[in-house]
From Swiss-Prot:
Originating species: Mus musculus
Function as written in the Swiss-Prot or TrEMBL entry: Negatively regulates T-cell antigen receptor (TCR)-mediated signaling. Involved in positive selection of T-cells.
InterPro entries per the UniProt record, alphabetical: Sit1
Stretches assigned to the Cytoplasmic side: 46-180
Region span, Interaction with PTPN11: 130-135
Region of interest (Interaction with CSK), ranges: 153-156
Name of the encoding gene: Sit1
Bilayer topology term: Single-pass type III membrane protein
Tissue: Expressed in thymus and spleen, with highest levels in immature thymocytes (at protein level).
One cellular component (GO) term of this entry: plasma membrane
Domain of life per record: Eukaryota
Region listing for Interaction with GRB2, in residue ranges: 73-76, 172-175
Identification of the protein by name: Signaling threshold-regulating transmembrane adapter 1
Keyword field contains Membrane: yes
Length: 180
């Protein structure tokens, strides 16, 4: 049983690999792909070495920092009251009155700082320092929700609703849905 080949053994470099003169298009395509692969590899190595240089200078990306060093940002109303605000209230509908601590807790909103802590051994930037404030809690007892309380690793500052806009339609950092 002999096989009939269209090509002679002189037309092939090895079994299944045609010579350059018979399959020049395939060899050209292989050459282009190889050159593009080498260019991509050179660009990747260049970016990697620049990234390492920046990391050594303390200016690198945030991926190497712990969660405690990267502040969160958002409306932290849930941490004060234990429930998410469902409907926005405007100032015309709800004029300020002497509602006591419960009223103050509902009016106060918390926001975190967007500034990173300076790297150890470096001089802090001239930006605004993180302000620490007390959070006012309402005097009503909170219903115990099943499960642990959410943890938040950020410093916060209480602000009134007039000072910052609230975002009632969005979920925020470490917020949990209100119990039904």
């Amino acid at each position: 049983m002999s096989r009939d080949y269209n090509c002679t053994t002189d037309d092939q470099l090895a079994w299944g690999i045609p010579s350059i003169s018979h399959a020049w298009g395939l060899w050209a395509l292989l050459g282009v792909v190889t050159v593009l692969l080498l260019i991509s590899l050179a660009a990747l190595l260049s970016q990697w070495t620049r990234g390492r240089r920046r990391n050594q200078e303390g200016q690198g990306p945030l991926s190497g920092r712990s969660a405690e060093e990267v502040p969160l940002y958002g409306n932290l109303h849930y941490l004060q009251t234990g429930r998410l605000s469902q409907e926005p209230r405007s100032e015309e509908q709800d004029p300020p009155s002497s509602g006591g601590l419960a009223r103050g807790a509902e009016e106060a909103m918390c926001y975190t700082s967007l500034q990173l802590r300076p790297a150890q051994g470096r001089i802090p930037s001239s930006g605004n320092p993180i302000k620490y404030c007390e959070v006012v809690l309402d005097s009503e007892p909170k219903p115990q929700a099943p499960g642990p309380e959410p943890e938040l690793y950020a410093s916060v500052c209480a602000q009134t609703r007039r000072g910052r806009a609230s975002f009632p339609d969005q979920a925020y950092a470490n917020s949990q849905p209100a119990p039904s």
